Structures are given as C-alpha cells and as structure tokens.
Design a protein with these regions (language model features):
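PAS-family sensory modules
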Residues: 1-58, 132-135, 142-156
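Sensory/regulatory domains in signal-transduction proteins
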Residues: 46-156
Length: 156
C-alpha cells in the first residue's frame, strides 16, 4: 500500500506520461514527423533523455514538463520551474512577440523554424535559432497545452 505522498507521486507520473503521449501524437499529427525519441525506453525516459530540449506547458501557460536538455538550457531544476508561468523564459522586451507567436500556434496548430530570444534563470540571453512549437491535443481533440522542441540555440 502506498502512503499519501507516494500515491500522489504515482498519480503525477501517470499524468505526465499521458500528457507526453498526447504531445508525441500531436507533434506527428501537426508536422507529419516523429519526435527524435529513443524507441527502446518508456515514454518518460525517452523524453527525458532526448538530446534536444523539449518543454511543455498546460492550457494555462504553466510549465508541466522540461526534459534534461531543456533544464540545462534554461539553467533550472524541475522544482524551480514546474508550475511556474512560461513567461519567465522570455525577456520583457520579447513578451509581446512571444504572445503573438503562441497565438499563431493556437490558430495554426504548430509553427516550424521558430526563432526568438530567451533568458536563463541567471539572466543570460540566448537565441533559439530553430524550434517547432505545437499544440498538444487530447484524444477528444481538445487543446491541453503546448510544447516545444529546440533544434538549435546560441548564447548571445
């Protein structure tokens, strides 16, 4: 039998596993491509170990997942970022452009070849040179969040 804390943790793992399953399916549906995930692992490990940064947020714009590469890129830990607003990743000067971009993703389902400036937790700016951002949809075709995979970035 699980203690209350362990049961909560298992529930969270199941919840993120389901979200990542929808993220993977949505990526393929929108882009006609596959995410570069290792096939011989469970889904969470495949996302976690992907060499490219992958992050997602829920329908309200709060981070619900970052893989190891994304945590490293943004210089954060999961405890520092999960449940926090994704606005923290863009400098104030880029917020208007960021909002415009997310609205385009809402309208079109995804955007390829995204470029934009982002900021790490210690204030260092970097340029995303190539990324895909897509809507994550559930089995009933309801939008449940958005996700990004970053193919290339450079320090500024």
């Amino acid at each position: 039998m699980f203690s209350r804390g362990e049961g909560s943790l298992i529930g969270e793992v199941e919840k993120i596993n389901k979200f990542l399953e929808f993220a993977q399916q949505s990526f393929t549906k929108h882009t006609n491509k596959l995410l570069p995930l290792e096939k011989n692992r469970d889904l969470i490990s495949s996302f976690d170990e992907c060499l490219l940064p992958i992050a997602s947020h829920d329908i309200n714009g709060f981070f619900n997942y970052l893989n190891k590469s994304a945590l490293s890129l943004f210089k954060v830990t999961k405890d520092q970022v999960i449940g926090r607003s994704t606005t923290m990743t863009a400098p104030k000067s880029e917020q208007k452009q960021r909002n415009k971009l997310l609205n385009q993703v809402n309208s079109h389902g995804f955007i390829d070849n995204y470029k934009g400036v982002r900021v790490t937790s210690d204030g260092e700016l970097f340029q995303i040179e190539d990324a895909t951002i897509w809507n994550v949809i559930d089995k009933n075709s309801h939008k449940i969040g958005q996700a990004v995979i970053i193919y290339k970035s450079n320090k500024l």
